[in-house]
Amino acid sequence: QVAHCAALEGKLPFINFFDGFRTSHEIQKIETWDYEDLKDMVNMDAIDEFRAHALNPNHPCLRGSAQNPDIFFQAREACNPYYDALPGIVQNYMDKVNEKLGTNYKLFNYYGAEDAEHVIVAMGSVCDTIEETIDYLTAAGEKVGVVKVRLYRPFSAEALIDAIPDSVKKISVLDRTKEPGALGEPLYLDVVAALKGSKFDAVPIYTGRYGLGSKDTTPAQIVAVYHNDEKAKFTLGIVDDVTNLSLKADEPLVTTPEGTINCKFWGLGADGTVGANKNSIKIIGDNTDMYAQAYFDYDSKKSGGVTMSHLRFGKSPIKSTYLIHQANFVACHNPSYVDKYNMVQELVDGGTFLLNCPWDMEGLEKHLPGQVKAYIANHNIKFYTIDGIKIGKEIGLGGRINTVLQSAFFKLAEIIPEEEAISLMKAAAKATYGRKGDKIVQMNYDAIDAGAKQVVEIEVPESWKDAADEGLAVPHIDENGRKDVIDFVKNIQTKVNAQEGNSLPVSAFTDYADGSTPSGSSAYEKRGIAVDIPIWQPDNCIQCNRCAYVCPHAVIRPVALTEEEAANAPEGMQSIPMIGMPDMKFAITVSAYDCTGCGSCANVCPGKKGEKALVMGNMEENAGKQTFFDYGREIPVKPEVVAKYKETTVKGSQFKQPLLEFSGACAGCGETPYAKLITQLFGERMYIANATGCSSIWGNSSPSTPYTVTPEGKGPAWSNSLFEDNAEFGYGMLLAQNTIRNRLKGLVEKLAADAENEDVKAAAQEYLDTYTCGATNGTATDKLVAALEACGCDRAEKAELLKNKDFLAKKSQWIFGGDGWAYDIGFGGVDHVLA
C-alpha cells in the first residue's frame, strides 16, 4: 500500500524484495489489512496525473531516447529532486497507515532498550530474530537495540540518525551479501556515510556478514554480535579458520516466548510430509487463537531427498526466523534415518519422539543406534512408533504415509483435542480430495482414524541409559578410488549428507575456492531410499537392455562377462549365455542402495510370454545383491561387444559405461535417461554448458556430483553460468576450444610438412586428416602425442604441443537447459517447430 501510493505521488518505481527462502517459504499466521480502511488514503489526483502522463497516441510523446554525451549527464541530474522528496512521501503514507491501523511504521524503526549502548542496524527477516534476542537480553539487564531499515533507497541519513538512541556507544551493521574486494558491504557503507559528521561521528561502527545462501542466523549468533568487542569485521553462522572473521556463538538459546511449542519432522522428498505439515499449520492457525509458523528445509535432491519441516505454535507472536534445534516434538517419517542423522538429540528433556517404522521391541533393539537409545532414556523422552507404510498399503494409499502420520502427530502433540483434530483433518481431506471421488476421500478418512488409533507407546528399557555411542552410519569408502574424490567425500560430503554441513569450517573449502568439485562423488552416497527395487529374472530376459536404457539413475546395467569373469563372480550372481556371442555371459545388475524404486525398468521390460524379466521386490530383503552390481562395475567395458551390437542401438549403447550416475533427480525422471545416453556416446570428450534449472540441480548440486569418469580418468567437463545466457556461454566454450585448436593445428601442419621423424610426420598427417571428426580424432591425437614423446627431437612445436596435449583432440560441445531457458515453457517445442 505504502509503495503503491508513494510510487504514484513520487513518480518513481519501487521494488518490494524478499531476502530468500526464509521469507518466501515460510507460512505465518498474519493480520491482514482491509482495503476499505486504506482506500481513502490514496491520492486520486496523483492517479489522474499518472494516467494523464502515460503513453497514449491521443497525446503522444517518446521515451527512452538515445542521448549523446553532450546532454546525458544533465538529463540524469534533473531527476534529483524526485529522489530527494521521496523519503518524506513514504513516511507520510506510513503515518497514514499507522493512524488507521495502530501500527508504527517508519523509514527506520528502533526496537530495544531506551538507553541502548550497542545497536544493530539490519534489514529483512533477521530483524525478527534480533528483536526476540533483544527481549531475552534486556530481561537480563543488557542495554541493546536494533534499527530496522524499511526504506533502503533513497537512503535517508536524517531518518537513520533520528532512530538511533543518543546513548549508543557501538553500532554493528549486518549485511546479507558479499561484495569481494569492496571495503565494506552496501548497508555498512551507507551507515558509515550517513553518520559521518553527525552526533554519532565518534561511535565505532562494526560490520558483519550473515545469512549467505540462506545460512541460518540464530539468537546465539546475535548475542555474539552484541558481546563482540574484538572484531570490527566479522561473519556469523560459520567457522572461519582461514581469515578468522567469524564470531563464536554459544550453545543454542531458547529465546521463544514461554508456551511456544516447537515441532520438527524429518521426511523423504515426495512422501507427503511437507504437504501434511502445511495442512497441519493451517488447521491450527485457522481453528485456534494460537499463532502458527511453518518453514520447510530441504536439500537439493529432487523427490527422494531429506526434508525437514519446522512448525511452531504459541499464544504470542512468533518472531523466530531460524531453524528449530530445541524441539518439544520430533517425528521421523523414514526409518532409514535413525542411524544417519542426529534427530532425537534436538529434543528438550521430556519431549516426544515419533518414529515411523515396522519394528517391534526386538526390532528397535536391533536397529536403533546406542546414542539414540541413551538420549531417549537419559532425557525422559516419550517414545512412540507407528507403521505408517503398512497402514498406507492396507488402506490403498501405497507409500503416501502423510495423512497417517499427521493424525498421529495431532494425537500426541495435544495442541487441539483429538476428536476436534480428527474432524478438522477429515474436513481438510474432503476439501482436498473431494473432486477425486468418494473412494479417495474415504481412504483418507480411514488413514486419519488409523493414524490416531495405531500409535504404539514404547516402554523405554532401563538398560538404554548405558547404551554405547555407535556414531552415525556412513557408506563404506573405497580407498582405492581417486584421491581427489575420496578426500572430498571424507572431508565434505559425509558431513553434509549427515546434515552436519554447518559445522564445516572455511578451511575445508580452500581447495574448492574456485567453485570446482571433483567428478563422481555421488557413487559414494548409497542413500538406500527405495522401498522396492528391480530383481532380475534371467529365464525371462531377452537381453534387449531397454531397462538400462530408461533407468534415470544408471543403477541397472548389463554386464558382458568372459567365462573366467563369470566363474569369479560373487556367490549367487546369475548369468546366462549372451545371444550372438556364445563365448560370453550376460547379466543384469542393480545397485540396490542407489535405486529410487521408480519401476521404469520393470515397466519397459518386454519379458517372455507375458512374464517380466524384472519384478519389483523389497529392497531390504535384496540389498545383498549390491555385491553383484559392485562386481559388474569392476568388469571392463568390452569394445568387441559394443562393436557387435553397435553403440548407435539401444542394446549396444548400454554396454558402454554411463558417465552420469546416481544423480539426485526424481524417481522416474524423464531428463536424465537422455543425458546419461549422451555421456555413453560422447562422455569421454564432452563439454557441457548447463543452464540453471532442474538439470543443473541433479547435474551438480554439491556435494553430490553424478557426472563421473572412465577408468582412464576422462569424462564430461561441466559448468553452469546463469539461467538466461546458456547459449552464449556454451558458444563461448566452443569458440575458446576452436581458438586453441586452430593455433595448435598450425604447429601440427609444420610437423606434417617437414618433420625429420617419419613416425611424427605420419601421425601429424593422420591428426590433420581427422581434425574435424570427434569419433576418430581422439585416437589420432593419442598417436601424435606418443610419436612426439618418443621421437627425441627438440623442435619448438613438440614442446608446445605436448604442453597443450589435452586441447588437441576434437571435443563434443553440448548445451543443456530446460524449457524456461529455451523460452519454451508450456509449448513442448511446438512453437519452435512451427517457427
Segments and roles (model prediction):
Residues 421, 434-595, 602-687, 691-814, ...:
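Ferredoxin-type iron-sulfur electron-transfer modules and their immediate structural context
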Residues 1-20, 32, 44-47, 197-211, ...:
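Conserved thiamine diphosphate
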